[in-house]
From Swiss-Prot:
The gene is pepA. The lineage of its organism: Bacteria, Pseudomonadati, Pseudomonadota, Betaproteobacteria, Nitrosomonadales. This is Probable cytosol aminopeptidase. One of its GO terms (molecular function) is metalloaminopeptidase activity. Its EC number is 3.4.11.1, 3.4.11.10. GO terms for biological process: proteolysis.
Amino acid sequence: MKFNIKNGTPEKQRSACVVAGIFEQQKLTPAAEALDKSANGYITGILSRGDMKGKAGATLMLHNVPNSACERVLLVGLGKEQELGDKGYRDAVRAVFKALSDTGAADATLFLLEAPVKNRDLSWKVLQIAVGGLESMYRFDRLKSKVEEAEPKLQKITLGIIKSLTEEEQTASEEALQQGLAVGDGMSLAKDLGNLAPNICTPTYLAEQAMNMAKTYKLKVTVLEQKDMEDLGMGALLAVARGSRQPPKLIALEYWGGAKKGKPVVLVGKGVTFDTGGISLKPAGEMDEMKYDMCGAASVLGTVHAVAKMGLPINVVGIIPATENMPGGNATKPGDVVTSMSGQTIEILNTDAEGRLILCDALAYTERYEPEAVIDIATLTGACVIALGHVASGLLSNDDELARELLDASERAVDRAWRLPLFDEYQEQLKSNFADVANIGGRAAGTITAACFLARFTKKYRWAHLDIAGTAWKSGKEKGATGRPVPLLTQFLISRTTRQPGSTGETGSRKNRRKSKE
């Protein structure tokens, strides 16, 4: 789907559909006013009959609007004008694309940039429309023999704006559009990987996808095999892989777009392509969803894809420890003690606490990059779902400044995160009588003790941990990967390349971007 930004008045747009907003109490936005004036009160006449009241997310499709060059006019409710915030605006965008996908329209012109969203500027709205559009049109049907839903005919979106933009506004808007499209593409990639069946998306498959991306964007990729990990002493990662016939991989994907000797930001994504729990076997119900236990890895690949597509002037390394966690005659047993790459010994009390085992070796491996900062992303604990539900990802960090950067990015991207503590007192729960540390700390504060375990392997750099167990996928009727936290991670990296006040969502200047290879 193609996007562009264009000045003009809505009634003169030769488009299959023009979209305009309506506030509650039937107050028209400037675009709706222009359409209504051209049509001699046609729209206000319809509204006066009660067909639409401007409720947030409501839509009304009109055909043959008098004196309008377009085939259709879609009205979308924006709620109360003084209360329009992030959620209301994003809900309206999704409602628009849902309504458009149900029509035969091949193109549409959206006049939604004029809506006054609290504490957000034009660039933020442009980015949200691009991301929301791609997200709304996403389909995953590649494994079906017959496609149940016809492909949407919508191919072109124009972001219309009545007022003339300054050169600075035009540049910032175009930049935001490219960022939004890159984020949307990165989310789609992460969703595709998460939604694939686990017999397809294996550790080897993830390595192949990284190699394909490296070829496309001329990145450096390294794939460590089991023998390489043995030589490095990655006893924790290999302990998880012992029960599976699928060979484990450790994937390193390097993007060097910043200063030649600049330290990279390293993203470490948990890549358990299927998690049975191992000998500590999970219940059968909903075990199919454990194919999503590699969504941390998927988000790293999606973020690196977005960064490379934008050509950001920053150095980023993605590290993915990938394996299955299966029971078997050679599988790790509860009570086994293994030696991690760092030299620390670990008593494995529960084989279903495997994510932290593969991450601890990946985090130790990360030291060779002398990173500026490290962020690991993992579907790590059910406790995080209990604590934060499916709205916010859990954030824990050994560095306050890094945590603030990530929280700011989460607010700008509307990809929520919430910080939890890493108090030393929680380390008491990880004590073992037989090793340096146990891999679980009991039921209490499960998200925190999991991060406390990881913190033991991150002493040499600034580090943050994102627990995405509640946000990486949806269950039930809408089952599927969400693509989170690609928006948060990408915004975090964008913010590091530009001066970007948190309240306005500014996206910076094009001149700060590295030329993209696409």
